[in-house]
Amino acid sequence: MASPIIQPAGAGIHDIFTQLELWESIDKGLSMITILRDNDVLWKPFLQLTLFNQLNIVRKAWSATIQKASESDKVPTLKDVYTSESSFIAQALLDTKNLQITPPATPRTALSGALLAKTIVIFHHSERAQEELGTELPEEVRSLVNQNAICLKVLYNANQWHIDLHYKRDSLSSAQAGEVAEIFEQYLEEALEAVASAIPPSPPVEDDNAGHGGLCKERTDCPKVNRCIHDLIEEQAIARPDQEGICAYDGSLSYAGLSKLSSVLAEQLKTFGARPEQRVAILMNKSFWYPVVVLAVLKSGAAFVPLDPSHPKNRLKQLISEIEPCALITTSVLSELADDLGCPSLAIDSDLTRSKEGSTTALLPNTSASPNNAAYIIFTSGSTGKPKGVVVEHSALSTSAITRGVVLGLGPDSRVLQYAPHTFDVSVDEILTTLIHGGCVCVPSEDDRFSIAHFMESARVTVALLTPTSARTLHPDEVPSLRILQTGGEVLTEDVNDKWSNRVTLFNVYGPTEASVACVISNRTGLKGAGHVLGQAVGGKLWIVDPDDIERHLPDNEVGELVISGAILARGYFRDPSRTESSFVRMRNGERVYRTGDLASMDSAGTIIYHGRKDLEVKIRGQRINIAEIEIAILQCDLVHSVVVEYPRSGLFEKKLVAVLRFEDSSSDAEDGLFGGAKGLTEDIYCLLLSHVSSVLTPAMIPSKWLSLPCVPQMPSGKADRKQVRGWLEDMDKRTYTRIFHPNGTDNLISDPSDSMVAIWLKVLKLEPQSLRLDQSFIRNGGDSIMAMEARHQAHEAGINIDVRELLGSRALQEIGEMATKTSAVEEVSKIEDDRDEPFPLSPVQQMYFDKVSDPSLGLQQRVCVEIMTKIQPDMLREALNHVIQKHRMLAARFTKHMGQWMQQVPFGKNLKHLSRCHIYSQAVGSLGDFCSEPMALEDGTLLHAHLQSSGERQTLVLCVHHLVVDFVSWRVILQDLHDALAAAQNGLPSGISRSTLTFQQWCREQTKYASTLIPEAVLPFAPGPVNLRFWQPSNVQAVSNTYSEIVQHDFRLSSTQTTQMLEKFTTATVHPTDLMLATFALAFKRIFTERDTPTIFIEGHGREPWHASLDVSQTVGWFTAAFPIHLPKDTLLNTTTAILGASERRRSVLANGHPYWACRYLSPNGQKVFGDDPRHQEMEFVFNYAGSIVQRAPGQTLFAENVRIAEIGHPNCERFSLFDIGAAIEMPSSELVVSFTFPKGIAHRERVAELVKTYQELLETAVERDLDLSAKLSSPLVCPADVVRSLEVNGVCIERDVEIVYTPSSIQQHMLWRQSQEPWFYRVQGDWTIEKTTTQSEPVDIDRLSHAWNQVVHRHTTLRTVFRYSSEEERFVAIVLHEVKPAISIIRKGIQTSGSLCRDDDLSPPHRMVLREKDNGSVVCELEFSHTIIDAASRSIVVQDLLDAYDGKLAHRPLDFPPFWEYIRLAQSSTPSARKEELHRAGRVVTLPFQPTHVLSKVPEACKKNEITISSFFMTAWSIVLAKHFVAHNQRVDSTSSQAVAFDYVLSDRSANIPGIESAVGPYIRLPTLETHVKEGVSLKNIARGLHAQCTFQSLSQSTQDGSSLELPSKATALQKYSTLVNIRNSGSDSLDLVSDSGEWKWILQGFSDPWDYDLVFAVNVHAGKVTGWTVEYADGVVEHSAADEIAKDLNDVVERMVCEII
């Protein structure tokens, strides 16, 4: 084919591009659609934006197009795949698993999700377009482009943009392509119109780049947005009046409410004289009122000036005196402080019309501001000692807010955190920029700011601007709603960048207050490293100049001063023309620039890099602070002669303000050198200075460290030599630091640096133990508010509660620590008893040992070999070992059989003192295996043996201990304590014994108690696979010998490089190297042994997971090891990625690394019963243990060589625990992963096992070296049992395409599903409503419209799109949430007896149905039926109300502001339930005995109020009395001295869980707790009721969702009486009894309702609007006799009447 004709250089951009694309289209089978071809007017304002903003608009419009066209709920991500000098290519990737199942109704324009999953966007810069035509793209890029059916091609230059959409004709029809193009044009046009409305027409700006070198590489500055801030916000209020504008801890406001309140207040402010260029001060704490006040001041025409109530009163008075405001707006809480400031004030409370001056609020003449009037004044620190007020005009902030909002993607769906103090300019951005873009401002309380994660989650914050220091205290998992994080105010450090860059869209922002908050932005998403790169200009122009000559622009990459120009610049400093003139400079060409004082450089692309400051200004936690202002304040003290304040960047004073003083009475002679005379301040002088500076400086400006010098070093000019002082501070060593601040040494109050609170102080304050003063406050020790937040977080992790406000007060750390301990004590487990001189139970792994080993004395030993670096004597070693044994008495334990059960005992007192606890050998041994090869006597022998072997100057120590008393972790403790004892002996010091953690005896005792509380069904989320030991038995052998003398071993290793890659790639929040090794082993096994399923693997762990934070066994010696089974079915092993994800999902779902399972299996009677006879839990085919690094020596153990060898050796005749042992460890010092397979040599398939090991190695190495894309799927909860996957596929359901989520239902749901599988009438909720017209003029009910409305409701709620399947392989039900379902709806029209569309019970129908019947009178009967597995009583009201709204056309406009049900399960379920097949007895049909209402019903609420009990407690009391009468145990008489114990379950709503929006969610949010109480004859009914009410209240609070026990199986309380009974107080869902549509034309009337529960007797009470409407007694026919049930119902009626009469 002929080549295209290339036009000459003068050809227009459109002609060149058209010819190029025409040729490509013919050649490649493409067709083309031009976007917005003839609309120059619309493009013109767009061309005034920066290139950064232009590209962002196009990219966002294309992302929105893909999302809408594919009907996805996910926004596509654009990933750059190619970049050259003048073009780049991006690929839009869409997560297709959320696309709908069924196609749209019009197949002609239907778009397949696969076609839109990957699309290409190509950008060309037109000035290089001809050169690009002959440029070959890399092969992989061309291949990637050709794989996409749709390509958007963009050609641009400074004066013109041209966009074409290309599509493959064999993949898309012209109609389909046209639909995509139409959607894209719509979004692009809306964006261009928004730009046009924000940027009014302006004359073209001359291109002055030629004269300004580095001046703005791509664009002139952004045109001025000549609008008032409040006008832009009012436009949003008109556009979205009902949308939430303010969401605060103390209230919320819609945009309409915000507009109305601010307008009323603005009129009041005018009576105070508010008008343009006048000032209004605001003195308020955080509140929803503050944004109202800010907007009101702007509407009044004045400028607002925020003041901080926490600042010193003298400073506030100084500011008030300077700005002379016409009014001061405050709150009643701060009114006393406001009165002292001497300014007319207005207190804002709920009544806006109340004024202290008694002024009227009549509407006054309009005094609105213009865009050039002042909008606000922010005061920053000043070098003269006087704060300087930055005056910012409306147009400056409007320009900045609009341009930055476009870059950040702010919009109506943005919920922005208002975190910064009001006196920071960032708060202006958080409030006004958010409102300008139609978002919601989320305002925490002052206390919330110290634990901000909780507020961010509850307020559903999506955008935040934090300093890197503040961002460091948060974790991405704590704020799942956060989508955009901006960091600014400080240099973005590497750790903060790496923590967030892959979890949110991360921006680094820069800008002084003088440039309207921010003017440089860098997108750090996905990038690593520190953020010294500030980014590119947004909203203005920036360039680099010579600090001594700003007219000289510096070349690219040269460091100079950063200057800013453009419409975003502030007016200047308030009433300070000299400082304004020096900072805001007019250049020779007339351009006005601001000199930032920041040193920076700019590269050829316009990217700015920060290099520090040229003056004395520093940023502390985002606040600009001028050092000179602090120094001036300190010099006002008479006793200070001179001062230098520094902010060191490294060393012991890193990022702390340090004041270096010379006092008036000090000698200037430096006898000990320049800094030799440095001293700390006495307490009196420190308090005097602190009192003074606290009265004039803000808290952030007060130095945290103070010291004095005989003289301050000076330069020849006479000025202080700051560089020398700073260098001395940064280089100061610990010895000098201690001499200055702790000269007496004895003042140090630390007795134990390992104390948990002390450890927190040391870590957070970054101090050495000798530098921490517990007798001083947190602030006095160098702390600040950010450190206080970090300390609170660290304490919380340690199970300790501390109050941030106390930390920031004057209390000493010692006192705070004592208070914290007392506060936390109520949350700890009951006091743990001390060790006793008596036998105590075994740990689970010890019990397993005695169960499996026929001769326990043969058993296992662990041996450690370490080289001694400094020679020791045997006697010294003996004493050191005796010291270790005295500290860890388990090393001298004895094992005895007591009544057939093995127990253990440790020696006490004299027994310990005189016991020969260890044997020391000195003769040579051949090898480590030869030493101590004889069995150890468990009952009366020695369990610790040591061998000290000398060879010349070298000594080697070998320690051998019976495995029953140690594990791998124990050796780290033993070696450390042994080293310390030897070191103390060499130095002639005594060896102290301290026990900071539990003893092994205490752990075993508490563990046995804990195990008794565990439920076997809840400790293991996935059932093990079938065990198949016979597979390994040779046909000619009766049994395979599995002892340590009959084993063989195969090993392989990964190189150090591969090992490093493994640790880096597979050590994340969700993936562990264990997952990789398990997954690749399973894949290898599947490949080699094709004839059988993959085996269950028991994962071995250290077993030291505490169930409460107060249990610390980190320094305890004993055998703790635990294990749990995991099975990766071969059908789920599709590839390496899915195998790793499956292993990760199953491993992480097991609570506490399997410790609860292990404890339950061996220590719990129920666990022994459930697991004891199940071979899957008893016979271990494979055991896997990843030990990590096996080096045991700590860095400080200088007596020992670095390399420590450790081995586990079994006696030749000892039985092994499993058939195959797979061990993995990182060997040091080579840093290589070593994997070993150990198995009996007599097994079958030995050759294939060798193949297995080889294949395993290959797969493991390949996985390590490949770049597996795990990130996109780690959050995908679509791991589904293989048999369920197969059943879904039979029904045409694809997991990845059609399923939203797969999760394990709660234990309550599992129980309901089991019961329904046997007797389907249980837990089937039915309600019948009549829907009728309210007037004769009303339109008849449209039955088809009602059916369509129900479809909308079903689509809205995930529980209504949930189907349940049973997995036979894993013996549990699973819940599958489908993207699309077709609900079961039956329509029976007038005169027709059969349904138009039959209700179905097919495999893909959720468990609910609707039947609609038309009546002759125009009404409709609606029958709704649900399984209780998907709704509760409150859900019924929600669903019916949604149906009404959908019928009225209002549902589609309501936000989805409620959580899916599985979020509740994850919070409430202590572990994923494993519901075994329940043995349920047939119960028969449910019979209902209705109660006939009497006058007594109306009196129940009054009786309850009078006695301060709830209606629920009233009726539960009545039920208790009836149960006590009917079910008294045989031979038990109830009299005045005895009481009858009764128990019953009751239905408790669990919508108090701390999950935002749960009150609007649909699902079974219920618990079924058991209430056990005593009914005593002779006690009044009133006292019984009050006691039961208190018991219920305590129980509901103590069994909160947070304790993980919320969703356990119902107990049915059958232990105390014959029948299982339930009390169901139906006070939720009553809103669905009678409903009227908003239009008032028709109403719903409940005709009947049934709700059968699987209990022998159910007492159900209906409560509506606080009134009792009736009750019923329901019983299971065939279990309860009718006569007995009837008698119970009659007695219940009598008891209720008697209770009302007695307690009213």
Curated annotation (Swiss-Prot):
Ranges for region Condensation: 1325-1477
Keywords on record: Isomerase, Phosphopantetheine, Phosphoprotein
Listed Gene3D superfamilies: 3.30.300.30, ACP-like (1.10.1200.10), Chloramphenicol acetyltransferase-like domain (3.30.559.10), N-terminal domain of ligase-like (3.40.50.12780), Nonribosomal peptide synthetase, condensation domain (3.30.559.30)
GO BP: amino acid activation for nonribosomal peptide biosynthetic process; conidium formation; pigment biosynthetic process; positive regulation of conidium formation; secondary metabolic process; secondary metabolite biosynthetic process
Entry's Gene Ontology cellular component terms: cytoplasm; fungal-type cell wall
Residues annotated as domain Carrier: 748-827
Keyword Isomerase: yes
GO molecular function: isomerase activity; phosphopantetheine binding
Entry coiled-coil feature ranges: none
Enzymatic reactions: L-tryptophan + ATP + H2O = D-tryptophan + AMP + diphosphate + H(+)
Residue positions where O-(pantetheine 4'-phosphoryl)serine is found in the record: S785
Keyword match Hydrolase: no
InterPro entries: AA_adenyl_dom (IPR010071), ACP-like_sf (IPR036736), AMP-bd_C_sf (IPR045851), AMP-binding_CS (IPR020845), AMP-dep_synth/lig_dom (IPR000873), ANL_N_sf (IPR042099), CAT-like_dom_sf (IPR023213), Condensatn (IPR001242)
Purpose: Nonribosomal peptide synthetase; part of the pathway that mediates the biosynthesis of the gray-brown conidiophore pigment. The first step of the pathway is performed by the nonribosomal peptide synthetase ivoA that catalyzes ATP-dependent unidirectional stereoinversion of L-tryptophan to D-tryptophan with complete conversion. While the stereoinversion is catalyzed by the epimerization (E) domain of ivoA, the terminal condensation (C) domain stereoselectively hydrolyzes D-tryptophanyl-S-phosphopantetheine thioester and thus represents a non-canonical C domain function.
Free-text note on domains in this protein's UniProt record: NRP synthetases are composed of discrete domains (adenylation (A), thiolation (T) or peptidyl carrier protein (PCP) and condensation (C) domains) which when grouped together are referred to as a single module. Each module is responsible for the recognition (via the A domain) and incorporation of a single amino acid into the growing peptide product. Thus, an NRP synthetase is generally composed of one or more modules and can terminate in a thioesterase domain (TE) that releases the newly synthesized peptide from the enzyme.
Family classification: Belongs to the NRP synthetase family.
Name used for this protein in its record: Nonribosomal peptide synthetase ivoA
Organism: Emericella nidulans (strain FGSC A4 / ATCC 38163 / CBS 112.46 / NRRL 194 / M139)
Name of the gene this protein is made from: ivoA
